[in-house]
């Protein structure tokens, strides 16, 4: 059977919080089968846990943020969550000593590297997938996102930015998920923002950790980063990365096709909630044979460069 996975070792890293600009220590710990992904704030007493669950997401203004009834929060979870999805990790405790996950380089790549350092441990319990059984769609003005049945996990995402630096041909991406494909084609895409927005946010004491080291920054005409883009379609690729992280807030891999036009964290979360609220829209699935699995995860001992 396809089994659940956790980490082999505890791993730690430090980085800067995007909004606070302060140093954050991130610790990833192994967890037992059926624990799920749990985000934990260790700088409050007692520590506060947030299970990976669409209902934990209560703020999607500038990132995906988990917030509890007391207002305790962990922001910017989507890139790490995408890395967990990409590596097929079902169970882990994610500890931070701050109200946000460190931004690192603005992509999921540093988190993939961290997970590879930890190693993957298979557990003696079946991996449970969420299989989409019927179409579900959410619209917001001209933006929309939907799930349709599909024997795999496919992302079909289109953005529409009228900007000289964003080529019209590079605004749509169709990606058939596999761990290898995620690491090579998706994980290195960085978040992006406009200089005028960053300056405004910083005047409001937000985005204090924002810099050319952790984002693609644009003015009205061009990309301001000296090194340019990592690949031509880095903008839409990052939106796919965000969506993979947002959808993994379900706590389980999904078997289905996600289609979106100009979607963002809020719409992604609304769609996930709508699917899970409709008992006819999905079912649990497990797979006896790796060969028969519609979603390809990396072998636990395979190092993905």
Swiss-Prot record:
The EC number(s) this enzyme carries: 3.5.1.108
Gene Ontology CC annotation, any one: membrane
Active site residues of this protein: 265 (proton donor)
Pathway recorded for this protein: Glycolipid biosynthesis; lipid IV(A) biosynthesis; lipid IV(A) from (3R)-3-hydroxytetradecanoyl-[acyl-carrier-protein] and UDP-N-acetyl-alpha-D-glucosamine: step 2/6
Cofactor(s) listed: Zn(2+)
Residue positions binding Zn(2+): 79, 238, 242
GO biological process, one term: lipid A biosynthetic process
GO MF annotations, alphabetized: metal ion binding; UDP-3-O-acyl-N-acetylglucosamine deacetylase activity
Source organism superkingdom: Bacteria
Gene3D superfamilies hit by this protein: lpxc deacetylase, domain 1, lpxc deacetylase, domain 2
Keywords: Hydrolase, Lipid A biosynthesis, Lipid biosynthesis, Lipid metabolism, Metal-binding, Zinc
Family indicated by similarity: Belongs to the LpxC family.
UniProt function note: Catalyzes the hydrolysis of UDP-3-O-myristoyl-N-acetylglucosamine to form UDP-3-O-myristoylglucosamine and acetate, the committed step in lipid A biosynthesis.
Xref: HAMAP family: LpxC
Protein name, entry field: UDP-3-O-acyl-N-acetylglucosamine deacetylase
Species in which this protein is naturally found: Vibrio cholerae serotype O1 (strain ATCC 39315 / El Tor Inaba N16961)
Lineage: Bacteria, Pseudomonadati, Pseudomonadota, Gammaproteobacteria, Vibrionales
């Amino acid at each position: 059977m396809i089994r659940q996975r956790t980490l082999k070792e505890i791993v730690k890293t430090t980085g800067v919080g995007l909004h606070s600009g302060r140093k954050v220590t991130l610790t990833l710990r192994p967890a037992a089968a059926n624990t799920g992904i749990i985000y934990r704030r260790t700088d409050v007493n007692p520590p506060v846990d947030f299970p990976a669950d669409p209902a934990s997401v209560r703020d999607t203004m500038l990132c995906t943020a988990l917030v509890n009834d007391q207002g305790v929060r962990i922001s910017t979870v989507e890139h790490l969550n995408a890395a967990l999805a990409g590596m097929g990790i079902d169970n882990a405790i994610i500890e931070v000593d701050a109200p946000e996950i460190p931004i690192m380089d603005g992509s999921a790549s540093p988190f993939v590297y961290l997970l590879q350092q930890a190693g993957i441990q298979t557990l003696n319990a079946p991996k449970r997938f969420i299989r989409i059984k019927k179409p579900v769609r959410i619209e917001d003005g001209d933006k929309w996102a939907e799930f349709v049945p599909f024997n795999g996990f496919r992302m079909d995402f289109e953005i529409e930015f009228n900007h000289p630096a964003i080529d019209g041909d590079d605004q749509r991406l169709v990606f058939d998920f596999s761990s290898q494909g995620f690491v090579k084609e998706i994980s290195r895409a960085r978040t992006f923002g406009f200089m005028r927005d960053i300056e405004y946010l910083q005047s409001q004491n937000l985005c204090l950790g924002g810099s050319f080291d952790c984002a693609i920054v644009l003015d009205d005409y061009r990309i301001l980063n000296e090194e340019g883009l990592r690949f031509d379609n880095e903008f839409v690729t990052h939106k796919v990365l965000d969506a993979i992280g947002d959808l993994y807030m379900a706590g389980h891999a999904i078997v289905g096709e996600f289609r979106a036009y100009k979607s963002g964290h809020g719409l992604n979360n609304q769609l996930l909630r709508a699917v899970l609220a409709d008992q006819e829209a999905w079912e649990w699935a497990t797979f006896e044979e790796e060969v028969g699995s519609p979603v390809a995860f990396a072998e636990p001992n395979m190092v993905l460069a």
